[in-house]
């Protein structure tokens, strides 16, 4: 059908990067920012004993740097691709798909957690977050994002948000 998987798309993009991790981290402050209220989400999940996992196709070492700088590295787990430098270019190896019917590592994790009987809250913004959001128990989409448009079009229940404090309030109401 002329389609490529999420993992293949990201892997191709990473192969185009010729800079080292060191060079990329040197530009960290110019390009990395956090959405308002993320610290409140971390505090809320820690206080309530809710595991928090970042599931991302982004550069793992940048996510780790973000967590380290904010003192969250030990509080948040990662489900991301592993980066390797091959012939001066970045290569990414994503977690293997283990669940029947999964389309990418994002919904694969949600399906696995659901099979284990866990309640899954999913927060996303992109096209490749859709199947994971649809499979979750409670879905959140960044206001105006591709994920919000897809959920609306496909009538998948979700809550739109701009600030993570809104997510915290909604989860707190859901949990009672």
Identify the meaning behind each predicted range.
Residues 85-92, 149-157, 168-173:
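Short, charged, surface-exposed secondary-structure boundary motifs
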Residues 101-128:
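Conserved Lys-Pro-Asp/Glu-containing loop-to-beta segment of HAD-superfamily phosphomonoesterases
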Residues 1-75, 79-82:
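Alpha-helical substrate-recognition element adjacent to the catalytic core
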Residues 72-100:
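Histidine/lysine/aspartate-rich catalytic loop segments that bind and position anionic ligands
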Residues 56, 118-154:
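Acidic, Mg2+-coordinating phosphoryl-transfer loop and its flanking beta/alpha structural elements
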Residues 140-142, 158-163:
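Short acidic-hydrophobic, aromatic-tinged amphipathic segments that line or gate anion-handling sites
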